[in-house]
Amino acid sequence: MVKNYLVCAVRPIQDGWLHQKRTDLYTFYKQMYELSVASFRKFVEEPFEAILWEEPVKNNDEYTVANWNAIKELWNREPCNIFWAGADTIMTQPTKLFSDQVKEYRLFNYTDPRSYKEFPHYFNDDIQYYPHTMSKEIWDLGEEMWNQREGHPDQHWGFDQIRHNTMFWKQNIPESDRLHPWLAYQAMQLRTMSPEEIEAHNQWNGINLRDAHILHFHASRGSQQVINLMNFISKEVGII
């Protein structure tokens, strides 16, 4: 039997977030995670087990390596589907996450900027799907790319997203099946429910907020505002 896992990491980072000596982000993200996982437990339609990795790391580089190794070890332990959702995400309506129709490693929506370096279409990697049918070649590609990490200009922030985009775009997925913004609505500057803010984000994502199933807040900026908004949304949709 194939198991389903919802995974996330909220780790103390010794050197701080992007070299900012801030301990408040860890506390903020712990609060966000509790709201996030509660939303997935309410709305995900398939059975799943939630896992949170909390072991401390020295810096952002170690953070990405630790998360990759944890996901890889879990995937190789038993037949399973793994859905990664960052702590600053919230699900807002019933959703099938672990569909057998999806056979490949997935990202779901653009990030900001929408293009970057060798990627004309650059996707956000804080929501990812590792199905049990994911190919060994894509796992191997992800492993091989660690050899490019040391000394890379984006080593301490962004390299992992480059690596994940390389894995995603290497696969033979129909172009019509790559973009699924309703599973990763990018709410990067959404901090209130003002009509103006919502409309700006609807335009960016190409869908209406009310049609989104998962929102991603990019909460290292305006963390307390995000917590307040996640609490508001949680009450509105009956999570708390």
Put a short name on every predicted segment.
Residues 10-11, 86-90, 218:
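Anionic group-transfer/hydrolysis microenvironments
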Residues 1-69, 73-80, 221, 228, ...:
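N-terminal anchoring/stem segment of glycosyltransferases
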Residues 34-41, 71-75, 95-99, 164-168, ...:
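Short amphipathic alpha-helical segments and helix-helix/interface helices
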Residues 6, 49-52, 83-86, 107-109, ...:
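A structural signal for short, well-ordered beta-strand segments and their strand-loop junctions
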Residues 60-122, 128-133:
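GT-A fold catalytic core of metal-dependent nucleotide-sugar glycosyltransferases
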Residues 127-238:
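Catalytic core and acceptor-binding pocket of nucleotide-sugar-dependent glycosyltransferases
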Residues 14-16, 58-60, 91-94, 99-100, ...:
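Short catalytic/ligand-binding loop motif for oxyanion handling, primarily in non-cytosolic enzymes
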